Amino acid sequence: MDKKEYCYYCFEVVAATLEHRKVRDKWNAKSWTRSIPLFVKFASGKGHDKQLRGCIGTFRARPLVTNLTYFSKQAAFCDERFRPISLGELALLECQIDLLVDFEPIDDPLDWEVGIHGVSIKFTANGIRYSSTYLPSVAAEQRWDQEETLESLIHKAGYYGSIRSLQITATRYKSLEIGCTYEEYLHNLELLG
């Protein structure tokens, strides 16, 4: 099976939602019962001009079809950082799925490699719990080192106080990235009839 089918399916879910119709399961998605954590991301543009349009996922392993269906809608319509994706912009989009694997708790929140690992942090400050994560591609795309990434993660979590005394719990992980364009999705639909 071509793993790009996962991306085709995400585009189908978003298109069906925007067109107020049922999802066509051309890929037998109901058979995708393997449980795995994942993130779904939509972006517009190409290369260095690529702009994120939505990215939401989970560390909770649930059946693949369940996570893909739910998080394709969440990334397209519910990421509060962006306006919801519209029908008119679908043709400009790429979909990327990150299947998350190889989770490892780490003692030092800087013990991971840029471009290889994603990192998830958790900490408590003033009685409030904070957490955030970056997928493996983020630090490399931003050209951050581990320290810059950690500082950004702390701010992403919503904490802006002193970071010197924070007791951070960190986990590193890897991802299997799969991507396709909307054009590839349409071409695949055409091939499947």
Curated annotation (Swiss-Prot):
InterPro entries for the chain: AMMECR1 (IPR023473), AMMECR1_dom_sf (IPR036071), AMMECR1_domain (IPR002733), AMMECR1_N (IPR027485)
GO CC annotation terms, alphabetical: cytosol; nucleus
Listed Pfam families: AMMECR1 (PF01871)
Range of residues in the leader sequence: none
Annotated AMMECR1 domain residues: 1-189
SUPFAM superfamilies linked: AMMECR1-like (SSF143447)
NCBIfam families in alphabetical order: TIGR00296 family protein
Protein's name according to its UniProt entry: Uncharacterized protein C688.03c
